From Swiss-Prot:
Main localisation: secreted
GO cellular component, one term: extracellular region
The protein's role, per its UniProt record: Antidiuretic hormone.
UniProt-listed Pfam families: Hormone_4
Spans traversing the lipid bilayer: none
Domain of life: Eukaryota
Name of the protein in its database record: Vasotocin
Subcellular location: Secreted
Residues with the Glycine amide modification: 9
Amino acid sequence: CYIQNCPRG
């Protein structure tokens, strides 16, 4: 995931 796109870590 990304720093601004991490719904579940």
